[in-house]
Amino acid sequence: MTQEGKLEQQFLNYLHSERNYSVNTSTAYENDILDFRRFLNEQAISEYQQVTFLDVRIYLTELKQKSFSRTTVARKISSLRSFYTFLLRENVISENPFTYVSHAKNQLRLPKFFYSEEMEALFQVVYEDNETLTLRDRVLLEVLYGTGIRVSECAGILLSDLDTSYQAILIRGKGNKERYVPFGAYAEDAITDYLSSRTELMIRFKKEHDSLLINHYGDPLTTRGIRYCLTKIISKASLTRKIHPHMLRHTFATDLLNNGADMRTVQELLGHASLSSTQIYTHVTKEHLKSTYMKHHPRA
């Protein structure tokens, strides 16, 4: 391994052990750093210590020429600034060339969410029969929409995480932070109907584990597997616009705020470390209010 490769690995270890970043987040950092190293190799720059502010400006120009979105460019800058801050802390460099790099302010991109008619179509798919995998998909949809948890968090739910007496689930979120989220009667009924079928399937394939959600072989359902299941549900519902599974989380937050929930509660339910991450949904609800007004008021 080269010296540069060792520095990269030390940084990734730091993100995992000291910052408690998830594998997905660490991988995003790694990809951004490797892309920058590719650029440095093309510029005949062999060491991170040799990078100057001018080199960084050239790199940013290249990113813009490749038509990366503002969000992607901002993320790459943030990743590399963090990496060089780490190198500075480790006395590998004496100055961070990313310190004074600015970027165009990100355009506000409102989260997309499902409309009520679309949610009804999704639920019709998972209530069409009582086959084991349909029951599982019913749990999947009821839990994701009913709690607002991330797909990756849903994949990690164990039977021991369910507290049926309080109708709450222990969730392990980003940075291994734990929180309890409540679930409603629909999710509770879906889980109850599913558990006996889950047991039968696991006995058939001689599986023993505590994961709530399983695939057709009785193995734990992965994050990728959940996305695949949701994509199939969305396809069966014949929804025409471009949509993605994470919209269930957006829909959860938007529906809560539209129906009067306070911001702090929604923040806690979503597991957001900062209130600013939750405030994006207020823009969605304002758009909802405006569109409703424009549609229904006679003087709009």
UniProtKB/Swiss-Prot annotation:
Keyword Translocase on entry? no
InterPro entries for the chain: CB (IPR044068), DNA_brk_join_enz (IPR011010), Integrase-like_cat_sf (IPR013762), Integrase_catalytic (IPR002104), Integrase_recombinase_N (IPR010998), Integrase_SAM-like_N (IPR004107), Recomb_XerC (IPR011931), Tyrosine_recombinase_XerC/XerD (IPR023009)
Q: Matching PROSITE patterns, A to Z?
A: CB, TYR_RECOMBINASE
- Give GO cellular component annotations, separated by semicolons: cytoplasm
Q: Which CDD domains match?
A: INT_XerDC_C
Ranges for domain Core-binding (CB) come to: 2-88
Q: What does this protein do?
A: Site-specific tyrosine recombinase, which acts by catalyzing the cutting and rejoining of the recombining DNA molecules. The XerC-XerD complex is essential to convert dimers of the bacterial chromosome into monomers to permit their segregation at cell division. It also contributes to the segregational stability of plasmids.
| Similarity remark | Belongs to the 'phage' integrase family. XerC subfamily.
Q: How does it assemble?
A: Forms a cyclic heterotetrameric complex composed of two molecules of XerC and two molecules of XerD.
Name of protein: Tyrosine recombinase XerC
Which gene does this sequence derive from? Answer: xerC
